[in-house]
Amino acid sequence: GECVVAGMGQERAHRAAQLLADRGARQLVSWGLAGALCPDLASGQLLCPAGVVDAQGRRYPVTTDLQAHCLEQVCLGAVTADLVTWHETLVEPEQKQALYRRTGARAVDMESVAIAQVARERNLEFVVLRVLFDPADRILPASILANTDPWGAVRLGGLVAALLRRPSDLLRLPGLARLARRSGQSLKAMADALPALNQDKNVDKEPNPL
């Protein structure tokens, strides 16, 4: 098995999935963070959805037996409701509510549909393993988002300048740090459980950057 770190966005995810398929992968796993669209979901919760939905409402179901195996071995108690892939980060609670009403999906990410499309084209098994980062009612600071690169690293110089222009965002940073710790702990716990999946499903958690 092999893991490719693709960065954020559908284009990067599609390239990574194609690369893995070209290298002989039999299963594709969409792994990372997601945002809540539904108010009953909390930061740090695990997601293993039954399907992913694109912006046009097309649904891509995951491989049922692979999902069941993940729910038993990797993410016991995970949320299994559908996830929607969107083209940008949703900053305001109103945006999240609108997408929830439009799609019925309970969570959102920026990559899974692209991976699902490659899995369908190449006849590969597919599953999603995600951790919720931001609750549906949480505002994400624009200064942070504008200065975060596709790999999730923050450009400190740009962030300082943005915070000087929007000092109110400073008040949101402690809460954002708590979300990062909570979701990071859940991601680590899920990663620690992956060897049980590797034994049967040939998934490797060692990253090879794209």
Predicted regions and their residues:
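Generic structural signal for well-ordered, non-membrane alpha-helical segments
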Residues: 9-13, 63-67, 92, 108, ...
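Regulatory input/activation interfaces that engage signals or partners
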Residues: 132-200
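N-terminal hydrophobic/helix-forming segments and targeting peptides
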Residues: 70, 208-210
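Metabolite-binding pocket within alpha/beta catalytic cores that recognizes anionic/polar moieties
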Residues: 1-75, 83, 106, 121
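Active-site rim beta-loop-alpha module in soluble metabolic enzymes
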Residues: 64-141, 145
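Glycine/charged-rich beta-loop-alpha catalytic/anionic-binding loops adjacent to active sites
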Residues: 1-3, 53, 96-102, 170
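Intrinsically disordered, low-complexity terminal tails and inter-domain linkers enriched
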Residues: 199-207
